[in-house]
Design a protein with these regions (language model features):
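Nucleotide-activated sugar donor-binding and catalytic core shared by glycosyltransferases
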Residues: 1-150
Length: 150
């Protein structure tokens, strides 16, 4: 979690979270050890993919922002790894669907099925490799730009 407040909220909303090993900050130290992540859509989803962490993605915003986005932005996915793969690799939950029941269910599906985690990590190898070394951010931005133009 980014801060103690978010961790406390998660514990209140999802009772199962109280039993999980939660970390505050230190993302790059925590991700290599993580079995699963729940992340808000943004660059953190790409970091999760880079570290091969199965991730459940959520996106919540004001309804007006959401509706305007739906009108003007035509993409099938919101998580960068899904955009790069051209399909859903990380499960995504948007607006009302981004609720504690759906997020916990998907996170537990990853936790309960080591085979599913391994399969996903192999898919994430392909995504991470597509980012390459130096200049990767530029290549990722170009890929997204091409998708937005289409």
């Amino acid at each position: 979690f980014a801060n103690e407040s978010l961790a406390a909220q998660a514990k209140l909303l999802v009772p199962e979270v109280a039993d999980w090993d939660l970390r505050i900050g230190g993302l790059h130290e925590a991700l290599p050890e993580a079995d699963v992540a729940i992340a808000s859509s943004g660059t953190v989803t790409l970091e999760c993919a880079w570290f091969r962490v199965p991730t459940v993605v959520l996106y919540k915003t004001s309804w007006i922002t959401y509706l305007l986005g739906r009108l003007f932005v035509k993409v099938k996915h919101i998580a960068m790894p899904n955009v790069l793969a051209g399909r859903e690799v990380f499960p995504e939950f948007i607006q009302r669907d981004a609720n504690e029941v759906n997020l916990a269910r998907e996170a537990n599906r990853f936790l309960d099925d080591p085979g599913r985690r391994l399969e996903l990590r192999e898919e994430l190898d392909v995504i991470a490799d597509s980012l390459g070394g130096r200049g990767a951010a530029g290549r990722a931005a170009e890929s997204v730009g091409r998708l937005l133009k289409n």
